[in-house]
Amino acid sequence: MAKNKLPLADVTEAPHYHDTWTLLRKYRDVVWSLEVSVRQVRNRFRIDYGKTIEDFLESVYLAGADLSGTELEHQAKCIEQSHKMLCLVDSAVDLMRAKHKNGEEFYWLLYYSYLSPQELQNVEEIIDQLRPHIRDISPRTYYRKRKEAVEVLSSVLWGYTAQDSAGIVREFLQ
């Protein structure tokens, strides 16, 4: 009986794959921007209103004031959206780390490549940091495993495509 195989598209051509790469490449910048934005809003409230943002919002809520359409509402929504995106990525990375068979290894690959607070200068520095977590790692192995880690993270973030699922079901049924 011949195996019925569908041609598989190159994973690097899938849009969710590129979305994940873009998301990871911008992760540090988004974290930085979010921290700066929150700090600026907090400082502005202390200067303008003489109280914390939490105290200000509580007094607005108690007074029944409506902040719709204000600059404050716009800033809050931007900060909230960035925070939710970071939480989504962090949650997906945590799930991958805890549940995937190579999760711990993939976590450290993604951490030193994209998620750590300080960007490392080059692949050699990343590999040096990875050595305690992944033995016998070479630059070639690093790139291969990093690609695998991004693919796994993509599947957690965006789900499997129907084509991916069909292949899994075929393998399971054989």
Annotate the PLM regions.
Residues 98, 115, 119, 155-159:
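Alpha-helix capping at helix-to-loop junctions
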Residues 117-140:
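Helix-turn-helix DNA-binding module
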Residues 17, 27, 114, 142-143:
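Aromatic side chains
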Residues 22-25, 84-91, 104-108, 137-144, ...:
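Short, well-structured alpha-helical interface segments that form or flank functional binding sites
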Residues 101-125:
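Short amphipathic alpha helix immediately N-terminal
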Residues 142-160:
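DNA major-groove recognition helices of helix-turn-helix
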Residues 95-96, 113-116, 133:
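Alpha-helix C-capping/helix-to-loop hinge sites
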Residues 1-101, 158-174:
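N-terminal interaction/assembly modules
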